Regions:
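NAD(P)-dependent short-chain dehydrogenase/reductase
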Residues: 1-44, 80
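Short, hydrophobic secondary-structure boundary micro-motifs
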Residues: 31-33, 61, 89-92, 136-138
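Amphipathic alpha-helical segments that line or abut small-molecule/effector binding pockets
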Residues: 43-54, 121-125
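Amphipathic terminal alpha-helices
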Residues: 117-148
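Residue-level signal for the nucleotide or nucleotide-sugar donor/cofactor binding architecture
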Residues: 11, 37-43, 67-71, 98-101, ...
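Mid/C-terminal beta-alpha module of Rossmann-like enzyme folds, strongest
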Residues: 48-105, 145-147
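Generic structural signal for alpha-helix termini and adjacent loop/cap motifs
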Residues: 23-27, 52-56, 127-131
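Structural element of the ATP-grasp superfamily
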Residues: 20, 106-107
């Protein structure tokens, strides 16, 4: 048995980066209700989860799967703004706390993500610039009260 907790896998059609990039591109304020996020490219998440099958056990093998370092929402917006040629607009102030996963056990047992967040930012912005289809479903990553 394995218990896997996945935090914000990224896809070009859906995810935290799509939410932020669309806001930046469209001139809408980026909500700083959550100051940082744990994110991972979906391909890496699938790879690491499959590797975890070698570790299933009783009691359950427990694993957090996401990026190894939290990423600032402000930094993501500024970086994607640069790629999109738009200065981001922000709403609110980033709190000092965030829902972040500790993925050190993941790194020790099944490895590190291979695709950098910077690369996914570039892919996401190019996807949106070429009118790539999105799922149109926000992640609500910035919500702190659990009401989506």
């Amino acid at each position: 048995v394995a218990t896997i907790r996945l935090s914000y896998a990224l896809d070009l059609r859906y995810g935290v980066l799509v939410d932020i990039a669309e806001s930046v591109r469209d001139g809408r304020p980026v909500d700083l209700g959550m100051g940082a996020v744990s994110v991972i490219w979906q391909g890496d998440a699938c790879d690491l989860i499959l590797r975890s099958l070698d570790h299933v056990s009783t009691p359950p093998f427990v694993l957090n799967v996401s990026g190894l370092q939290p990423v600032s929402v402000t930094d993501l917006a500024v970086g994607m703004g640069h790629l999109l040629g738009v200065d981001p607009v922000f709403e609110g102030e980033a709190p000092t706390t965030a829902l972040i996963l500790n993925c050190s056990r993941m790194a020790q047992t099944v490895g590190d993500p291979e695709v950098s967040i910077r690369r996914v930012m570039d892919w996401t912005c190019r996807w949106l610039q070429t009118n790539g289809r999105t799922l149109g479903k926000p992640t609500h990553f910035n919500v702190r009260d659990g009401k989506f």
